[in-house]
């Protein structure tokens, strides 16, 4: 029901969003009579804000075609390694014809970057992927927009999130022996849970687990949100 309401709202807003876009261009163009108005820039800014609030933002591409490895430009090919109902495991495979560079590429460690799911695209970490590609074999979780996932695929909750992370880790362990895991912001908690459960079962755990900017213990450095939760719960 929530997505139907959202889509209805977005559809109703489309004419206003299109008008706001056209008006912003009109008032920001100094060659038009409207653009000569002393208040034109303020009016254009208002319409531009309305347009940005209402527009539908499409997923950007990673656009990583080459990467510099020890001073050598190496081609990068992005492909889907695993395709799950709610997530794609993407691989950035590097290619080179230089024997020395190829040997170094093969010796590089494997890293799984777990990107945030809630409200973000994995391309948010484009620069992180680009940097890691210099000396790592890089994989990243590319979460699908839940809005386009068929209801027949069922629900997706924290347990499923943890299972996905474990499946991706096991896949890389099967292909390479083991891997490193980096979680950024929101996925730090499910990644910690996934690896902890693997350890409790006696499974091989990743070589390292890096958790960046995540709410592992939200009681530390409390914010207004923490205080609200403590007072109202």
Mark where each language-model region is.
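N-terminal cap/leader regions of alpha/beta-hydrolase-fold enzymes
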Residues: 1-233
């Amino acid at each position: 029901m929530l997505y139907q309401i959202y889509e209805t709202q977005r559809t109703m807003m489309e004419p206003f969003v299109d008008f706001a876009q056209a008006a912003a261009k009109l008032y920001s163009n100094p060659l038009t009579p409207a653009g000569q108005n002393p208040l034109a820039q303020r009016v254009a800014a208002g319409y531009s804000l309305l347009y940005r609030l209402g527009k539908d933002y499409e997923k950007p591409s990673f656009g990583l075609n080459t990467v510099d490895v020890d001073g050598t430009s190496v081609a990068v090919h992005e492909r889907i390694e695993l395709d799950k109902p709610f997530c794609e495991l993407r691989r950035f495979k590097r290619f080179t014809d230089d024997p020395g560079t190829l040997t170094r590429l093969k010796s590089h460690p494997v890293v799984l970057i777990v990107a945030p799911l809630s409200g973000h695209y994995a391309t948010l970490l484009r620069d992180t992927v680009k940097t890691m590609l210099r000396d790592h074999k890089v994989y990243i979780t590319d979460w699908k927009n839940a809005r386009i996932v068929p209801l027949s695929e069922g629900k997706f909750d924290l347990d499923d999130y943890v299972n996905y992370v474990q499946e991706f880790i096991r896949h890389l362990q099967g292909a390479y022996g083991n891997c490193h895991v980096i979680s950024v912001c929101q996925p730090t908690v499910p990644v910690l849970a996934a690896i902890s459960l693997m350890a409790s079962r006696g499974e091989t755990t990743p070589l390292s687990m890096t958790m960046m900017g995540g709410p592992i213990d939200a009681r530390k450095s409390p914010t207004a949100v923490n205080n609200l939760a403590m007072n109202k719960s």
